[in-house]
Amino acid sequence: MDDIQNDQEPSAPETGIDLEKTGVPAVPSNQDGDQQNSKLPLPFALNFSLLMASRPMSTLAKAVSLLYALLKKRPKCPYTLYVVVLALIDSAAVLFIQWGMYKEPTYADPDAIDANTKLFDSIPGQLTKFVSQMWMEQKYIWLLNFLVLGMVHLALVFVLNRFWVATAIFSIVMSVFAVANSIKVSLRNEPVIPSDLGFFSSGNGGEITSFIPKNRQSLVNGTITMLIWLTIICLALQLIDGRRCVIPCHWWRPFRNVKTIIGNCIRIIAAVLSVTLLWSFTWNLGINDSWSYNWAKSLGDNPKPWSTVADATGNGPTMNFLRLAHTKTMDKPEDYSEETMAALAKRYKKSAKITNESRANKLTDNTVIMILSESFSDPTRVPGITFTEDPMPNIRALKNTTTAGLMLSPSISGGTANIEHQALTGLSLALFDNSMQSPYQELVPHQKSPYTFNQIWNSVYGKNGSVAFHPFYKHMYLRDSDYKKFGFSKLYTLDSKPEITHQDHLGTSPYVSDAASYQNVLDALGNSDHAQFIQLVTMQNHTPYDDYYPDNQFREADVSELSDDEKWDIDSYAKGVDITDQATEDFLNQLNSTDKPITVIFYGDHLPGVYNTAAADENNAIPLHETDYFIWSNQASVSAGTKLDSQTSSYTSSNYFMALAAEHLDAKVSPYLAMLTQAQTQIPAISRLVSSNASWGDGSTVYLDAEGNHVTSKNLSKEAKQMLHDYRLVQYDMTKGKNYLSNYGFFDVQ
């Protein structure tokens, strides 16, 4: 024991370091006086102490201390610099995003084009015009986009409270948006829209690089390089900037003094207000007469709901994107619930069962061809228009022998896709909120599985049960993406792959003729060994109405007392109607020669905007919204020669076409079709009428009775009001609600 007590503390190695000063504990000795593990390395604490005491580390510590002292004394960037940088970044973002909408023009004979025209038509020229229209045309579209992006930028700044970090994030997001927009426009002639974000949410984000074409890879690489450097610069500036926070605040001790409390409150208020402003602007932009809609309009915003690419080009991709981010679909019915919808489904299941007991046929035993004939209508029904020659003698005669009548259209000279959407879905535009301008662009992209009537054939014949043709461009009204959701196996257009086969034109018309359009349908019939649903949207009679066709006999046949200019357009249109009339007669004759049962639903979508004199008279509002339709079956069909009574068919609207076709075919129906059949009986025609000569906008709901008389909502019968309420419930459930009806077989043909 004495030996142990007399043991000395282990001495330090020969390094000149006093172990006691280092704070390293002594190494204990064993009973023999030897150090334990004497041959093992020195303890970690000792090694660390030695390292820290070395000259290099001492120098590094001094450098860090000096750097910290410098950082504490770093200057604060003035707020004016923030404002200047924000303005420059946002201006560049507007131009970069808009740049993606433009393409360099091509000329058939470049030598015939002067240098100034080439300059103005170039991408820099188009960008210059986009900005200069502020003082040239008093259209402040560039300023509007600048202010909107400013809202986004400021919201990021106030939420993060770090100007340079927020600027880096803003620049990255806007650059990605600009590049993605440019690539999508080059590939599909469509800008980026909110529904595209679903591509990432569905787990396909990793595949996005596969869509980048080779000629755009340099743009992507250059943008990535630019963003890397910009991010480095912004992060460096964040370190250098002595104003670490835009708004001084402290979360560690938020109530330590009055100054801290005020700073924290300002920070919270600024973040909440900036986000609320951006949210409110986006939420209301697509709603007519809202504050953001009116403010944007005052700066020159001119919504183009018929075309996202036209809207993005004219108003900016940012405005187009935010406009489609939210649209009010319709108000929720007060009694909407799962219990209500279950009871409704049960009621119409019973109705369908009763109807089907007296019907012998199936819809899917027939090929149904739904033809939207662009702008087709009878010119002689327009007040003040008189011809000595009938422009549509064949269809007029046909209407006397088959189910036919007049269709109430929502608009004049436009809104084609709205009428088309009604015909394919059975939904009525009149039941949507007035802010719903174009369901194809504002509703369908947000729906997961929208219901359309072609799906009846798909349920029997699979994915080849339905096909569509449109001899124009697929980006119009987002038909390409919407038709995929509808379940069409293919939409053949001028720019589809493969293209629509027959593209013949007549005279100098820029549009594919109806005869060529019909030939595409005939080819589809010949290539299928089963019944199918075929959708055709024609283009021949689309505006403008120039002197396309030679030997226009209606120049002489027009005896209307109108101005020469107005008569010129009307006569040009009448010639197109005459050509459609003959092409349709030939088409139906060819259908009669086949042994396949075929039924055609033919309708004009709206009247052309050429009747200025008639449109000036408010009494002509309804006649100028009535087009011609017929439902016809060929000789191979058991419904050949069928003509529904006038009480049922004289007046209707496109949402009822499939219900009328089922009745014409004596075919069994689903509960949904049973509901539409009853609705058509109670309310023969319903439409949100735009009474002016315009394609889009607000309109009042118009109801027609079986004789075509206008009926106000107050004067609807009790049964009609209940029917209308059921219709609203169904439409809400299918579009904005929980889709309860799909769980009860509401769309299944029994």
Question: Model-predicted segments: where are they?
Answer:
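Short hydrophobic "helix-edge" motifs at membrane interfaces and signal-peptide entry regions
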Residues: W135, L363-D365, T594-K596
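Membrane-interface segments at or immediately adjacent to transmembrane helices
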Residues: T282-M370
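Acidic/Ser-Thr/Pro-Gly-rich, low-complexity N-terminal segments
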Residues: M1-Q35
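Transmembrane and membrane-interface helices of multi-pass
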Residues: D3, G16-I17, P28, K39-S307
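Alpha-helix initiation and N-capping motif
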Residues: L197-F200, N315-T318, E338, M392, ...
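Solvent-exposed soluble domains appended to multi-pass membrane proteins
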Residues: I354-R359, L372-S373, D378-Q750
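Serine-centered coil/turn micro-motif
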Residues: S54, S58, S290, G316, ...
